[in-house]
């Protein structure tokens, strides 16, 4: 559970300097476009758009790309795609549960790419509802430590509705109900604490521990899924120990 968060954080940092940067940018741009289409193009009145823009800025997406995506979503500029969100469920090797969120303009292509990635990497597709019950939708705010302690963060967010603060090594993640996400993010801002991202996510209620070989197989599958332009997010309930994580980082 926490292991997957740590791995995602590590991969995010590496993604800034490797070939996945372009795919990461594309996902962030899609988020902005969809948020503007659903809730309007003014970030001040659309918290989801505000958070999508902030995350893109933190990831060094050029401002002009961000603004064009906002305008396309809001209908101020032509060219916006008809993005649809589709969820797929399945299992990775070792019985690890996988939730796959696609944001696509072609449902058939998305379904095909997800199935191929799963099949070729030891995964199996599952019926709707047979995996998702293992996860709860939560609000997640991620922030770099920058000298902060867990108590510092808790003091800032506890009254705003935060449920938990997880230590991810170099960063913290603050968990809340999705409805409290904006309040938690605002509480951090009011306390002068900078944050990396604030978004709705899926948190596993039960985790599956794996050894080094198991972790390799799970993350090989996750990487294959994330190679699809239609896949927006992948969540698993894998639990990776610090020792296994360190061994993966060395590979």
Swiss-Prot record:
Pfam families listed in its UniProt record: TACO1_YebC_N, Transcrip_reg
One example of a Gene Ontology biological process annotation: regulation of DNA-templated transcription
Localization per record: Cytoplasm
InterPro entries xrefs: Integrase-like_N, TACO1_YebC-like_2nd/3rd_dom, TACO1_YebC_N, Transcrip_reg_TACO1-like, Transcrip_reg_TACO1-like_dom3, YebC-like
GO molecular function list: DNA binding
Main localization (coarse): cytoplasm
SUPFAM superfamilies listed in its UniProt record: YebC-like (SSF75625)
Keyword Protease carried by entry: no
Coiled-coil segments: none
GO cellular component, one term: cytosol
Keywords: Cytoplasm, DNA-binding, Transcription, Transcription regulation
NCBIfam families: PRK00110.1, PRK12378.1, YebC/PmpR family DNA-binding transcriptional regulator
PANTHER family linked: TRANSCRIPTIONAL REGULATORY PROTEIN YEBC-RELATED, TRANSLATIONAL ACTIVATOR OF CYTOCHROME C OXIDASE 1
Protein family membership: Belongs to the TACO1 family.
Name of the protein in its database record: Probable transcriptional regulatory protein MRA_2631
Organism of derivation: Mycobacterium tuberculosis (strain ATCC 25177 / H37Ra)
Origin organism lineage: Bacteria, Bacillati, Actinomycetota, Actinomycetes, Mycobacteriales
């Amino acid at each position: 559970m926490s292991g997957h968060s740590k791995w995602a954080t590590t991969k995010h940092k590496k993604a800034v300097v490797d070939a996945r940067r372009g795919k990461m940018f594309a996902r962030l741009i899609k988020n902005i476009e969809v948020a503007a289409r659903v809730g309007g193009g003014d970030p001040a009145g659309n918290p989801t758009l505000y958070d999508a823009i902030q995350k893109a800025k933190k990831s060094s997406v050029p401002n002009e790309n961000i603004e064009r995506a906002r305008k396309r979503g809001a209908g101020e500029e032509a060219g916006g795609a008809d993005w649809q969100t589709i969820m797929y469920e399945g299992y990775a090797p070792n019985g690890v549960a996988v939730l796959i969120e696609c944001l696509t303009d072609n449902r058939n292509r998305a379904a095909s790419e997800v199935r191929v990635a799963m099949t070729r990497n030891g995964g199996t597709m599952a019926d709707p509802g047979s995996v998702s019950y293992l996860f709860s939708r939560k609000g997640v705010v991620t922030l770099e430590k920058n000298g902060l302690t867990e108590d510092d963060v808790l003091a800032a967010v506890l009254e705003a509705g935060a449920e938990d603060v997880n230590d991810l090594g170099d960063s913290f993640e603050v968990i809340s109900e999705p409805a409290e996400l904006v309040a938690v993010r605002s509480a951090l801002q009011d306390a002068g604490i900078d944050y990396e991202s604030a978004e709705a996510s899926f948190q596993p209620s039960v985790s599956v521990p794996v050894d080094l070989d198991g972790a390799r197989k799970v993350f090989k599958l996750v990487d294959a899924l994330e190679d699809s332009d239609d896949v927006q997010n992948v969540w698993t309930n894998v639990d990776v120990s610090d020792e296994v994580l360190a061994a993966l980082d060395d590979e």
